[in-house]
Amino acid sequence: LLVYDNLLLNDKNEMNKDSSYDKKTNALDNYKNDSTIDMEKK
């Protein structure tokens, strides 16, 4: 997840002025939440 977090930070920096920034952030947050749940199940 460290690599993913770094990619997420880079995306946020690039998307700050983009109108779809919030939508993409929500999708990434949902992805991270799903990954965390999957890890807890295992």
From Swiss-Prot:
Keywords: NAD, Oxidoreductase. Residues 15-42 are annotated as: Disordered. Residues 15-26 have a biased composition (Basic and acidic residues). GO terms for molecular function: L-lactate dehydrogenase activity. Pathway: Fermentation; pyruvate fermentation to lactate; (S)-lactate from pyruvate: step 1/1. Its EC number is 1.1.1.27. It catalyses: (S)-lactate + NAD(+) = pyruvate + NADH + H(+). Homotetramer. Belongs to the LDH/MDH superfamily. LDH family. This is L-lactate dehydrogenase. It comes from Plasmodium falciparum.
